[in-house]
Each structure stands twice: as structure tokens, then as C-alpha cells.
Regions:
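PLP-dependent aminotransferase class I/II
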Residues: 1-153
Length: 153
């Protein structure tokens, strides 16, 4: 994914069975730590919010007051500067990615995807996902935000 290359193309119809019994057991054991994981993600997301608030609507996820919001992703509205921002972050050894790809772009669907999707085309070049995981520390998020600011100014 990094660097704008597409490493996850779908070229034929098939099945995606990837979870093993071991993976399931690890997932079940992780449930014991779920509240701690959620709290850490909320804390890191709040750092992103406060560090990037000068850019207004840069962060796409919003939490309503009174909701128990736990972010899965930190998605930015790059305002058309996605590739430049990705390149800048990569130079600074910071991972970023579009994450979700449109189904009509996969090779397997090329015979069926001959339609125009102007709204999706407009959105596609404007979003980018930043790191958010439990191994991140607050100082990492602050560094990421500093680099985002440098790239978008």
C-alpha cells in the first residue's frame, strides 16, 4: 500500500478464509483488555484532535457529546493533497494509506465497472488514514501531527 502502489488487487473470484483457531483464541483473550485498548485509542485520537484543530474540518471522524466514541481510524480530509502528504510522511518514516479501495477499481470487476462515479472520484483523492494503534505513544502522535502541519501549510 505504501507509496501509492496497489499490492492488494483482486484478480479472480474466490474466498478469503484467513482466521485460524489460534487467531480466534487470541481475539477472545484480547477481549479482557478491550476497555484499556478503547481508552488508549480515545486518548490518542484526542491528541490528534487538539494538535490539528487549527485546520478545522481536517479530521473526518466526529464524536457526538454523550456518545461512547472509540475511533478505529484517523481519517484526514487532505483537500486534494493526499499524494503530497503521503510522500512527505513516507520521507519521515510515517505510515499512511488510503485503506479502502473502490470495488470498481479491482481487476476482477473491470468488465462490470464501466460506469462513472463522480462523487466517489471527488472523495477518493481527498482522504488519508494516519496511524492509530495501541503501540503508538502520545509523543508519536504529536510528531505525526507536526509533519502533517508542515506538509499542508
Amino acid at each position: 500500500k505504501q507509496g501509492g502502489t496497489w499490492e492488494n488487487d483482486i484478480t479472480e473470484i474466490g474466498y478469503k478464509y484467513q482466521m485460524t483457531d489460534i487467531t480466534a483464541a487470541i481475539g477472545l483473550a484480547s477481549l479482557e483488555e478491550l476497555n484499556e485498548i478503547f481508552q488508549k485509542r480515545r486518548c490518542l485520537y484526542q491528541i490528534y484532535q487538539s494538535c490539528l484543530e487549527e485546520f478545522g474540518d481536517l479530521l473526518l471522524e466526529k464524536s457526538d457529546s454523550g456518545s461512547d466514541f472509540t475511533p478505529w481510524l484517523v481519517t484526514l480530509n487532505t483537500k486534494g493533497k493526499r499524494l503530497a502528504l503521503m510522500n512527505h510522511l513516507r520521507e519521515k518514516n510515517i505510515e499512511s494509506a488510503p485503506v479502502h479501495y473502490r470495488n470498481d477499481q479491482y481487476t476482477i470487476f473491470q468488465d462490470y465497472a464501466q460506469r462513472s462515479f463522480p462523487n466517489m472520484d471527488k472523495i477518493e483523492d481527498h482522504y488519508l488514514v494516519l496511524p492509530l494503534h495501541t503501540k503508538l505513544k502520545p509523543e508519536h502522535v504529536e510528531r505525526i501531527c507536526d509533519e502533517v502541519k508542515k506538509a499542508l501549510r
